[in-house]
Regions:
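A glycine-rich, often tryptophan-bearing local segment used as a flexible ligand/cofactor-contacting loop or short
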Residues: 86-158
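Extracellular ligand-binding/catalytic regions of CAZymes and related secreted enzymes
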Residues: 22-26, 31, 39, 50-54, ...
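Bacterial N-terminal signal peptides
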Residues: 7-16
Length: 258
């Protein structure tokens, strides 16, 4: 009995163990519902929360931009989940810039790649790396791995059948973009679009996911993620976590590609 009491007393004197009581890093997910992207949240929130439990990281989920009025330094990465930069007010935009310049990581998912109006926040557009042009209707296509050394590709087949909105982009806005995944335009119809709109595709080089170092931080971008069912797909969630892991830690890139 005396031994148990002694052990309890010693335990009270010991400092807390945050590395065990808390996750390996902390992530903020910004998921502001918008006109075309709101149904996905019912699926995405519990699945991303499960991802956090599975991989042992702390997660804060926000439906609004209020966290950008406070201190972002506790976050190893910020995920802009179908939430574009124009959702942020001017002061909040400055907070994101300061966060990245201090070494923070950003994961931009699908709708986050579209900024309206174009040219209103050049820093954010350069962070994304490419300017969105248009997309055809949702179709099934073949996705190719372009960089098997990057963790957002780990576990994916060399040719992956996926259904999504295949965003088209202009040329790179910055140097150093590393393409992770591309879509094979011969596997779908890039011109299948709504009346009054024109889509032509991008040709052989049609990136749909990439990463780069930007203004002191790490940025992973994936154009995939429109269908709500995507967030219930194990392969897609592995793709998403691989990019998040790198953005948060800088780890995971293999020395060689298989």
């Amino acid at each position: 009995m005396r031994k148990i009491v002694l052990l309890l007393a010693l335990a009270l004197l010991l400092p807390a163990w945050p590395a065990f009581a808390q996750g390996q890093f902390r992530v903020l997910v910004l998921a502001v519902p918008n006109r075309y992207h709101h149904d996905y949240t019912v699926v995405a929130k519990p699945r991303v929360e499960k991802m956090a439990r599975q991989h042992g990281f702390d997660l804060d989920w926000s439906w609004n931009t209020a966290p950008f009025d406070g201190d972002l330094s506790a976050y190893a990465a910020i995920m802009l989940l179908n939430t574009p930069g124009d959702a942020l007010a001017q002061g909040q935009r400055g907070a994101l810039e300061a966060y990245v310049r201090a070494g923070g990581g950003v994961v931009a998912v699908h709708r986050a790649l579209i900024f309206n109006p174009p040219g209103d926040w050049p820093w954010f557009e350069r962070m994304i790396g490419r300017a969105f042009r248009i997309h055809p209707m949702v179709q099934t296509a073949t996705v190719r791995i372009e960089d098997a050394s990057f963790p957002a590709t780990f576990g994916l087949p060399a040719r992956w059948i996926w259904s999504d909105e295949w965003y088209e982009f202009g040329p790179p806005l910055v140097d150093g973009l590393r393409t992770v995944l591309s879509v094979d335009e011969s596997s779908y119809d890039p011109t299948r679009i709504w009346p009054g709109q024109v889509a032509r595709g991008m040709g052989r080089e049609h990136p749909v996911a990439w990463y780069h170092a930007y203004d002191g931080g790490r940025v992973f971008v994936t154009a995939l993620g429109h269908p709500p069912a995507a967030y219930d797909d194990a392969a897609y969630l592995q793709h998403l976590y691989g990019g998040l892991w790198w953005a948060a830690t800088g780890r995971g890139i293999s020395a060689t590609s298989d």
